[in-house]
């Protein structure tokens, strides 16, 4: 250019710094940008710590400020955490203190309640036993003191004051309890020989008829109150601090509690023969022990003008020993004057035969006036105060030990010149003064007829047993009624002295039923659960007096049927009069016979029903057994069928495989057969053209076969050469032998190969040239003698390439 002026260069733009690193920007802009961005922890790679007073690059200053802020935040967090922990600890301590105060308050309330209970029952004589601990050994355990941990010491002064106040109150309560126990100890235990004094001031004895119920109830109530108070005192008073101070306190204890007496009574009931050692003079007196209400109106017997002499009863019962005082309470069962004594059949046979101790038995003849007869429920003996003028002079009187007759028997006392008395004649001996025990038992069950005794020929000749008459006796002849006529007329007595015992007939001339009729059970025995029990057949009348008093006869409690209630009442009414007209007696006998026939029909019906029921049960059991057997057989056959199905499946599969094999063999056989047929068949002579075609075809097939074999051989040889090539290459690398490259297709000697070289290379598809080059290189190379293995491998490799079959192909 003219003038030699150089071209003007554009000045470079100054480097733009970031906004955060530009010191020319105001601090307000930096603050706004800092508020937008989140706080970033500085990285030590490019941020260096700077001194507080150093004013340099703003980036260093901002990093320092951020670090300080982070430290301040961590400090505030730790401070808030410590403050929260202190608050939690404070609240926990307050909760513990509040719970302790509540526990102390509850203990104080419990102590006040114990004090009020102790003051309320301090006047009772049976508070607790001698060894019962009223106070535990530790007062703190009684008041439930809460033991605080040693670390909690806040507010100990207030708590100590409260504990001291509570201890003073507990001490005052202990003093009150001490006074109450001393008052209890002031009572004395009553002597064993006297009647115990109850808390209400009464005496436990045999009261009169009017006061019997309340006395028994009060005794039971006192026993229950004593047991309940004893348990409550044992549970409430837990302190044992004053146990030694009150160890001398005595308990007012009854000689024999009610439970012991009841157990003794039950033992005596279950073992009636344990009273054999009772004195003979005490065995003649019996007590009425059953006071059951009647179960039907037909069993009610009126006893007129029964005057209970309670004043005569009480002195006899005051001397009863404590072991049988509870039994003595139940022995008075008579009603006041003017009331009718109702007797019934008890439902519980166990209570019907209670035998009491000889010390508690009373003279039952004191209950009745001199002109009344009291009928017992279990005996047929006459009372002790009936007129004795009904006995003729010619009657034989039994000795003293035969005065008490057994239960359920019609005792007929015969004169000297007579063997039997009539059925309606019931005579009373002079010395029969003592009724049997259980005088409230007056009626047998209506369905129950007396059975014949086995040893009737061993009895005394003057005593007629209860079943001596073989006819069916009426109900009135089995029981002694209280309205018996005292002046018996001897002209109405019918004497059957010439007839033997087995041929007795009734008033109408009918023959007596045989023994087999009475040996069967009544129908009602089969209706009851205990239907297999009969009355004992052994008669106690021939036994000595001690054994007679100990006979334990059980009374069946069957109710009579409703349809014969009126008939039984009428029979019972007629049986009360000894002197009946013959017509009424015949009516009674006919009705009696009708009732017996009804019982026999009922017996047969019940037996048939029982047999039908038993047969039904057997049929049901047989049905269940057949059902079980059917189910067993069904399971067995089902298993057999399953096995058969499995076997059939196996057979079918085997058959299918056999068919498949047969089909294949058949096809092969058919092909062979067709071939043989074609060979054996006569064909037309071939023409020359056809023969030449066949030969050409055969040649082509041979060439094709040879070519396939050659290709297979070449493939195997190529694989062998490649393996040998890899082996030589590895060994040469192992011995650090480096060969020069054969061509320019690769930098290495092994890169030259006819299959991999380029199409402009001399070795491309030229196996012969490659083999010559390879042999020349191997032969010109100097391999040490020590590498004999490598040398042999290289020679084999070269010879293999020399024999490459592709040489002939190319």
Swiss-Prot record:
Predominant cellular place of this UniProt entry's protein: cytoplasm
GO CC field: centriolar satellite; centriole; centrosome; cytoplasm
Cytoplasm found in the keyword field: yes
Keyword terms, alphabetized: Cilium biogenesis/degradation, Coiled coil, Cytoplasm, Cytoskeleton
GO biological process assignments: cilium assembly; positive regulation of centriole elongation
Cytoplasm listed as a keyword: yes
Coiled coil: 65-89, 160-189, 638-669
Subcellular location: Cytoplasm, Cytoskeleton, Microtubule organizing center, Centrosome; Cytoplasm, Cytoskeleton, Microtubule organizing center, Centrosome, Centriole; Cytoplasm, Cytoskeleton, Microtubule organizing center, Centrosome, Centriolar satellite
Function description: Plays an important role in primary cilium assembly, maintenance, and length regulation. Interacts with centriole inner scaffold proteins to promote proper centriole size and integrity and assembly of functional cilia. Required for the recruitment of both the inner scaffold protein POC1B and the distal SFI1/CETN2 complex to centrioles.
PANTHER family found in the cross-reference section: COILED-COIL DOMAIN-CONTAINING PROTEIN 15 (PTHR14817:SF2)
Subunit-structure text: Interacts with POC5, POC1B, CETN2 and FAM161A.
Protein name per its UniProtKB record: Coiled-coil domain-containing protein 15
């Amino acid at each position: 250019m003219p003038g030699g002026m150089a071209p003007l260069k554009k000045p470079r733009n100054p480097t733009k710094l970031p906004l955060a690193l530009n010191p020319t920007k105001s601090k307000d802009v930096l603050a706004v940008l800092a508020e937008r961005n989140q706080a970033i922890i500085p990285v030590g790679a490019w941020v260096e710590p700077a001194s507080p007073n150093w004013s340099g690059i703003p980036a260093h200053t901002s990093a320092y400020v951020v670090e300080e802020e982070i430290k301040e935040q961590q400090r505030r967090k730790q401070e808030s955490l410590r403050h929260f922990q202190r608050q939690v600890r404070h609240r926990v301590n307050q909760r513990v203190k509040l719970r302790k105060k509540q526990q102390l308050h509850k203990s104080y309330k419990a102590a006040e309640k114990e004090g009020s209970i102790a003051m309320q029952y301090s006047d009772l004589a049976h508070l607790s036993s001698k060894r019962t601990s009223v106070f535990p050994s530790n007062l703190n355990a009684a008041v439930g003191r809460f033991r605080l941990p040693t670390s909690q010491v806040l507010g100990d002064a207030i708590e100590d004051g409260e504990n001291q106040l509570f201890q003073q109150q507990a001490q005052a309560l202990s003093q009150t309890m001490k006074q109450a126990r001393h008052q209890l100890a002031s009572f004395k235990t009553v002597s064993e020989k006297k009647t115990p004094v109850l808390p209400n001031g009464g005496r436990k004895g045999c009261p009169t008829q009017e006061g019997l119920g309340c006395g028994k109830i009060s005794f039971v109530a006192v026993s229950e109150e004593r047991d309940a108070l004893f348990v409550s005192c044992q549970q409430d008073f837990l302190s044992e601090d004053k146990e030694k101070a009150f160890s001398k306190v005595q308990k007012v204890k009854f000689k024999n509690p009610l439970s012991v007496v009841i157990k003794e009574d039950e033992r005596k009931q279950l073992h009636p023969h344990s009273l054999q050692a009772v004195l003979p003079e005490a065995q003649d007196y019996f007590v009425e022990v059953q006071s059951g209400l009647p179960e039907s109106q037909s069993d009610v017997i009126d006893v007129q003008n029964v005057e209970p002499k309670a004043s005569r009863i009480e002195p006899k019962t005051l001397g009863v020993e404590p072991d049988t005082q509870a039994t003595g309470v139940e022995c008075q069962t008579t009603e006041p004057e003017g009331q009718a004594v109702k007797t019934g059949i008890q439902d519980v046979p166990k209570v019907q035969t209670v035998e009491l101790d000889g010390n508690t038995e009373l003279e039952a003849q004191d209950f009745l006036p001199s002109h009344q007869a009291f009928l017992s429920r279990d005996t047929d003996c006459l009372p002790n105060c009936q007129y004795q003028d009904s006995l003729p002079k010619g009657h034989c009187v039994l000795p003293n030990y035969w005065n008490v007759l057994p239960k359920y028997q019609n005792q007929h006392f015969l004169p000297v010149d007579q063997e039997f008395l009539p059925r309606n004649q019931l005579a009373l001996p002079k010395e029969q003064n003592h009724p049997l025990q259980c005088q409230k038992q007056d009626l047998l069950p209506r369905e129950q007829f007396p059975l014949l005794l086995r040893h009737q020929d061993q009895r005394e000749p003057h005593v007629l047993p209860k079943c001596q008459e073989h006819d069916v006796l009426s109900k009135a002849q089995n029981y002694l009624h209280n309205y018996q006529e005292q002046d018996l007329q001897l002209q109405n007595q019918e004497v059957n002295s010439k007839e033997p015992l087995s041929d007795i007939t009734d008033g109408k001339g009918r023959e007596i039923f045989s023994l087999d009729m009475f040996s069967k059970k009544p129908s009602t025995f089969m209706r009851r659960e205990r239907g297999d029990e009969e009355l004992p057949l052994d008669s106690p009348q021939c036994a000595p007096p001690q054994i007679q008093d100990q006979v334990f006869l059980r009374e069946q409690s069957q109710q009579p049927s409703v349809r014969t209630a009126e008939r039984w009442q009428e029979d019972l009414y007629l049986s009360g009069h000894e002197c009946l007209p013959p017509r009424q007696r015949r009516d009674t006998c006919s009705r009696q016979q009708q009732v017996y026939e009804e019982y026999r029909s009922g017996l047969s019906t019940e037996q048939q029903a029982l047999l039908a029921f038993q047969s039904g049960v057997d049929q049901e059991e047989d049905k269940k057994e057949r059902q079980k057997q059917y189910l067993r057989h069904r399971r067995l056959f089902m298993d057999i069928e399953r096995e058969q199905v499995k076997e059939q499946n196996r057979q079918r599969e085997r058959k299918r495989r056999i068919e498949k094999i047969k089909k294949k063999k058949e096809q092969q056989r058919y092909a062979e057969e067709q071939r043989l047929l074609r060979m054996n068949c006569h064909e037309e002579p071939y023409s020359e053209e056809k023969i030449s075609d066949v030969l050409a075809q055969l040649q082509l097939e041979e060439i094709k076969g040879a070519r396939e074999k050659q290709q297979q051989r070449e493939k195997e040889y190529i694989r062998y050469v490649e393996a040998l090539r890899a082996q030589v290459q590895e060994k040469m690398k192992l011995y650090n032998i480096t060969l020069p490259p054969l061509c320019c297709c690769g930098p290495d000697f092994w890169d030259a190969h006819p299959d991999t070289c380029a199409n402009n290379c001399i070795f491309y598809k030229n196996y012969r040239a490659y083999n010559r080059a390879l042999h020349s290189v191997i032969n010109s190379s100097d391999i040490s003698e020590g590498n004999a293995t490598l040398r042999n491998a290289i020679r084999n490799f070269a010879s293999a390439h020399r024999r490459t079959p592709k040489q002939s192909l190319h």
